[in-house]
Amino acid sequence: MDEEAKIRTCQLLDLPWEDVLIPHILCYLPLQHLVSLQRVSKQFHSLIQVYLTNCRTFDLTSIGPSIPKEAFCSMLKDNKVLHSLSLQNCSDWVTDKELLPVIGQNQHLQRVDMSGCVCLTRHSLVAVSLSCMHLQHLGLAHCEWVDSLSLRSLADHCGGLQSIDLTACRQLKDDAICYLAKKCLKLRSLSLAVNANITDESVEEVAKNCRGLEQLDLTGCLRVRNQSIRTLAEYCPKLQSLKVNHCHNVTESSLDPLRKRNVVIDVEPPLQRALVLLQDVLGFAPFINLQI
């Protein structure tokens, strides 16, 4: 009877933490639930801290705006094994002061997303480049603090980079992008969108050096022309997706060879666009065959 009573009174925290709770239960809970569990009791706080110390992925995308910066520092203060760190939606509070210690003690990071973190500075990117030699994926969209020197540091130290999002990094010009292309030959995905400084020079350098390129986003790169798109078609046989919306100097003459290779392009062919426009303006939907 005593044994049965013990079984009946067994509680969740009585299970082995590192053998059962962490690998088979906590790893499936969203971060916001883990944060809530920390407040239940001292034991739960200790359990969650053990989990956070050993977790490989830390994603603040869903709770970024609501988490205090002090909580962020506390949760990751002992973690030295992170492989992936996402700070999207943390723009209101994350600064170099909070991020630099985390980057400095996590040299195995392969994926870092700082997109939209407007309060960071170039020091954070330099820290990533110096600490994270195994970095493969980097998100810097809308980080206007990214400059040529910090990007060059990244290129010098993270040659294994496979994808980088530089959307709206408007300080960057052709010289920085060309340097990146010459150093990071394994790039498969690149966004240079919303940057009027980018010209054919950047696109051609990327095409000639990054032969395994699969995805390229040039949305809003107003100075890109047909010549660089033709170079892209010549040197990048693995290209799968190209975005050139609002690239007014890129025409169908350079896009057609890519379409014939089934590359997904975000602008319709001229005839298709004309038919859709006619359909919208005149309301002839039942009479127009858009498969012409």
Curated annotation (Swiss-Prot):
Cellular compartment(s): Cytoplasm
Q: Which domain of life is it from?
A: Eukaryota
Q: Which GO terms describe its biological process?
A: bone mineralization; dorsal/ventral pattern formation; G2/M transition of mitotic cell cycle; positive regulation of BMP signaling pathway; protein ubiquitination; SCF-dependent proteasomal ubiquitin-dependent protein catabolic process
Q: What is its main location?
A: cytoplasm
Q: Which Gene3D superfamilies match?
A: Ribonuclease Inhibitor
What Gene Ontology cellular component terms go with this record?
cytoplasm; SCF ubiquitin ligase complex
Q: In which pathway does it act?
A: Protein modification; protein ubiquitination
LRR-type repeats, residues:
134-155, 160-181, 186-207, 212-233, 238-259
By its UniProt entry, which Pfam families does this protein fall under? F-box (PF00646)
Q: Where is the F-box domain?
A: 12-59
UniProt keyword list: Cytoplasm, Leucine-rich repeat, Repeat, Ubl conjugation pathway
Q: What does this protein do?
A: Substrate recognition component of a SCF (SKP1-CUL1-F-box protein) E3 ubiquitin-protein ligase complex which mediates the ubiquitination and subsequent proteasomal degradation of target proteins. Acts as a positive regulator of the BMP signaling pathway. Required for dorsal/ventral pattern formation.
User: How does the annotation summarize its subunit structure?
Assistant: Part of the SCF (SKP1-CUL1-F-box) E3 ubiquitin-protein ligase complex SCF(FBXL15).
Q: Which family does the similarity line name? A: Belongs to the FBXL15 family.
Protein's name according to its UniProt entry: F-box/LRR-repeat protein 15
Organism expressing this protein natively? Dicentrarchus labrax
